[in-house]
Amino acid sequence: MMNKFSLFSSSIYLSLLSSFTWAETSTEVLQTIQLQAETEGENLQQSTAMTKFSHDILDVPFSRSVLSKTLIQQQDVQRIDDALTQVSGVYSQTNYGGGFWDNFSFRGFSTDPNIGAQIIRNGLSVNRGLSAPRDMVNIESLDFLKGPMAALYGRGEAGGLLNINTKKPEWERSSEVNLRANSLEKYRASFEHTAPISDAVAYRIAVAHEDNQSFRDHVQSERWFFSPQLTWKISDSTQLDFDSEFTRQDGTFDRGVSSYQKQFVMDPKTFTGEPDDGNHIQKDHFYQLRLAHQFNDDWKMNNALSVKDTQLKGFSSEPRRIQSDGRTLERQRRYRDNKSDDILFQTEVLGTIQQDWARHEVLLSTELGQMKYRQLQLRRNHSGSMPNSIDIYAPIYGQYLPELPLFINTEEQQRYFALNLQDQIFLNDQWSVLYGARFDHITQDFQNKLAGTSSKKDLQQTSPRLGLNYRLNDRWSWYANYGESFALNSGMDRNGDVFNPEKGKSYEIGGKYQITPQSLLSLALFKMDKENVLTTDPADSNYQITAGEVSSKGLELDLETQLNDQFSIRANYSYTDAQVEKDQILAKGSRLSNVPKHSGSISSNYEWTLANADRVGLGAMAIYVGKRSGHSTDNGFNLPEYTLLNLNAYYAPTDQLRYQFNVHNLLDETYYVASYSDMWIQPGDPLNASVSLQWKF
């Protein structure tokens, strides 16, 4: 640890020296083509990803929340999970073994917990199958799109989805080094460089490495990330872009702590897995080629080819139940080797049609792709003949490493084609109407190699979306929207048939008030329903059927305001009532897990310039998350409410150099982020501090 701190301190010293000796250099900046699928990063007043056309937020009949690059830096966001408390209506779900993918719900509805949340990238669908957690070195901003987006982006939840705006190659040469050290022995270093190769070609390279310990015993991870990008301006009207990302993450598979009789009895530090199981290894490779052509001032075309493959494998010993003595935890040992491969081709044509009575903004797009998903799992439960248990108060490791029989061996293939049409009609300066629909045709093949069964189903789904927007004046707008969604269910029922997909409906009304050019207050009321949710088969509890129905309704209030050049405030509040409407086992009114009825946050930042032109900033953030169900069956086990206080400060002696200090969980509150059951509970980090350095040159 001392060597790492020495390296960090030396880097800070070198950067201080360089700030007095390095001169700025510049090169000619070329104008690049503005692509709808490749925005420079969403901001408070402009939106592209919600309709594919760039608009003032007051002209769009939907709601969203944006986390800019500045906010991401101020709040020391290291993972998408860290950003969720700053967004209304978005809640943490279990992130699979301590952080092997991003997972969260929108307005109470979440996707398959064995795959993670659906995410789009620069307005393009890319996240089908497994995905490693996104690295922040490539992220310009996070755009949380609320409400029905299936008509634009295909299958997903009715509550919304996340659009990640990534950084791009630039024609002005620049480099950036970021170093970070945390009191929990978490270390990170990243390097970014972009420059022109010629007047027509520019590149960008990003590299990041993490070496993370944990406040939890025997839990650690190491992560490598590499991303080369290339942009070629073929002509004044045509541009070709290539993006790639390579991620490897090695780490402990950690299910967290367990409860006994619905009570929190364990020390949050205690690890009940098996260190001798070794690390889980995750590899994620992503490639994307985009071609954009501008026909004229009114019409353009975007094309994209995306290829993605991800693998996760390793051994783990996971909690199963605590015996009647209240201290002996029975474990289940597993080996998993899961892999997904996805290829997707997309084409979209966007244009404007001006008529005497209205202006039309028209989108026509198609998608063609294939995704393969393989699950291989070996597992064995604790038994008298082959024990595998541990004392939760005095764990002794290395006693049991039982041999494992094959338990799951499945392969799923999805071939899909989609056609999408949308038209937003601006009748005048006040009224606009948006209508659109997407038709999906999916062939789903599922093979259970262990049982020797297979099933195939062709699915057709039409997802409409309607929106009405009324802009009263330059400050006020009101809107309403309706949309439908669907999401595939993986697996087979007891008859060997592939499940029908989940189907959802969403209704929303809301208003927006632009207090100042840099301040926005927004209110949204919503109601959603979903059917064909998987539930236990009453004829055989070893299987499931699509007989469940759930609903969610609520209110979201967001404020983003820049009071002056120095002082900014960001606040949000959510009320979400998400519950079961129909189920074979659960009672009507049972709560959906990890969804608090009440939550909110408020943050403020104050910045000023000293007499010598040095810049200083101070900030604070308070987070509240209410009580929520901690079990997927809502069996009476609850995660308690919690309040966190975070602080941040920075000092920038030059435009090229910035030092930052962050304190997380200042009051050192014991809290729990999310859980899958009363056996798998993810505790939050205790009081910790981080120091970071940013050096641009």
Tell what function each PLM region has:
Residues N338, S593-F697:
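Conserved C-terminal beta-signal and adjacent last beta-strands/turns
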Residues Y287-T310, R331-Q447, R471:
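Face-selective signature of the C-terminal outer-membrane beta-barrel domain
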Residues K233-S235, S340, R359-M371, T410-K530, ...:
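Structural signature of Gram-negative outer-membrane beta-barrels, strongest in the C-terminal barrel
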Residues Q430, K527, T546-S632, L667, ...:
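Gram-negative outer-membrane beta-barrel transporters
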Residues R290-S306, T310-S316, R471, S477-W478, ...:
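Membrane-embedded beta-barrel scaffold of Gram-negative outer-membrane proteins
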Residues E210, S214, F226-Q294, V307-S340, ...:
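Acidic/polar loop-and-plug regions of large Gram-negative outer-membrane beta-barrel proteins
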Residues V29-E172, I509:
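Acidic, small-polar-rich N-terminal luminal/periplasmic segments of exported/outer-membrane proteins
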Residues R128, V137-E140, A151-P228, I234-T238, ...:
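Outer-membrane beta-barrel translocator/receptor signature
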